[in-house]
Each structure stands twice: as C-alpha cells, then as structure tokens.
C-alpha cells in the first residue's frame, strides 16, 4: 500500500496493528519528489529516497511501515523512539512536512476493501481492509 501525503494532508503515522516493534532502520538517500510526477518520471524513487523503516510483529505476521522522505521535506521523526510495543492507532512517527508511507504486508494476511482503488483519499482511522483468516474486522 502506498499512501502519498500532500502538503495539505495530516502528517502523522499511526500503527495499523497492535504489535511489537521488531526493528527500526534509517536508510539515508536522496530526496526526490514523491508526488505523481516523481513516481511517474523517476525510476524507483520510493527506494532511492531517505527512509525510516519500522518492522512490527503482530497477530497475523510481520509488517513493515516505510516512511519515505521527499524533496525539501525529508524530516521523519519517531514520536517515541524508545517504544517497543504499540496499540492499533497509536502514533508512531510524523513528517515535519508531507511525504509518503509504504505499508508492506505479508501475502494473504490482509484483504483490501473492494471500493478502495488507486487515488482514493483516506483519512486517519478509516479502514483499508481486514486482517487475518476469514478477514475479520
């Protein structure tokens, strides 16, 4: 799941699950734009820009939250850098200005809502789909 944050969006990242923080990695990189133009014209921009990656173990497996810095706004901060456990909805990190969040989920662990399509604007607390066997809410 790629969630682009425009300058007018909310710039805080909340945990999508209750779970344990397994690892945190800060990868230095470029700060190319990650807007529609940047994604279209810059090869692998989401893996070339600066990233702050959080790996979390949860009831249905492991996920990675990749916070991607962008041109002029590569300022990604953990809300509580010492946290080892988060509840679903807890604030994890924030951008001091807009950028992008990439959520990597194990295959088969999550089912997206059928009405969710590319370009759909989502807000904090709105579901993207369902976790686990039988895809329970």
Feature map (PLM): residue ranges:
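Contiguous, well-folded functional domains in the mature portion of proteins
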Residues: 1-137
């Amino acid at each position: 799941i790629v969630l682009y944050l425009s300058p007018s969006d909310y710039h805080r990242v909340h945990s999508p699950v209750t779970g344990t923080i397994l690892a945190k990695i800060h990868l230095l990189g470029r700060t190319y734009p990650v807007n529609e133009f940047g994604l279209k014209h810059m090869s692998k921009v989401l893996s070339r820009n600066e990233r702050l990656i959080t790996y979390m173990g949860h009831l249905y497996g492991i996920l990675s939250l990749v916070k991607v810095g962008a041109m002029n706004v590569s300022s990604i901060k953990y809300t509580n850098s010492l946290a080892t456990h988060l509840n679903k909805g807890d604030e994890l990190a924030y951008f001091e200005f807009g950028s992008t969040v990439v959520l990597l989920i194990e295959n088969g662990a999550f089912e997206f809502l059928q009405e969710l399509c590319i370009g759909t604007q989502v807000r904090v607390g709105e579901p993207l789909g369902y976790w686990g066997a039988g895809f329970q809410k």
